[in-house]
Amino acid sequence: MESRATAKFMRVSPRKTRLVARNIDGLPVEDAMNLLRFTPNKPAGVLYDVLRSALANAQQMPGVDVDAMVVKQVVVNEGPSWKRFLPRAQGRATRIKKRTSHITVILAEGQE
């Protein structure tokens, strides 16, 4: 059985989130949660919340052994960017893109 959770429009950069997501792919859920809990950056906290949500979704399914769940796949896609302007010297302005991410975590039973 598979369990999934999705977080959309999260205010973290997709590029930085993929760096953290690559580390938990294929790990048992308990190990992945420990790794994310002690990783000191913003994408780790967001991924931790999505992983907890996927685990809670798995607990709602009958006949699923939550202790044997592994992270099957972590997908980080780019969401829409917020465009902002930063004032510069002599009346100029620079555009800043505040990027967002769509994050999906898929858990599966068994060892992979």
Swiss-Prot record:
A cellular-component GO term for this protein: cytosolic large ribosomal subunit
Matches recorded under Pfam families: Ribosomal_L22
The entry's keywords: Ribonucleoprotein, Ribosomal protein, RNA-binding, rRNA-binding
A Gene Ontology biological process term: translation
InterPro entries membership: Ribosomal_uL22, Ribosomal_uL22_bac/chlpt-type, Ribosomal_uL22_bac/org-type, Ribosomal_uL22_CS, Ribosomal_uL22_sf
Record keyword rRNA-binding present: yes
GO molecular function: rRNA binding; structural constituent of ribosome
Taxonomic superkingdom: Bacteria
Subunit record text: Part of the 50S ribosomal subunit.
Similarity-based family: Belongs to the universal ribosomal protein uL22 family.
Record's function text: This protein binds specifically to 23S rRNA; its binding is stimulated by other ribosomal proteins, e.g. L4, L17, and L20. It is important during the early stages of 50S assembly. It makes multiple contacts with different domains of the 23S rRNA in the assembled 50S subunit and ribosome. The globular domain of the protein is located near the polypeptide exit tunnel on the outside of the subunit, while an extended beta-hairpin is found that lines the wall of the exit tunnel in the center of the 70S ribosome.
Protein name as catalogued: Large ribosomal subunit protein uL22
Organism the protein comes from: Nitratidesulfovibrio vulgaris (strain ATCC 29579 / DSM 644 / CCUG 34227 / NCIMB 8303 / VKM B-1760 / Hildenborough)
Species classification: Bacteria, Pseudomonadati, Thermodesulfobacteriota, Desulfovibrionia, Desulfovibrionales
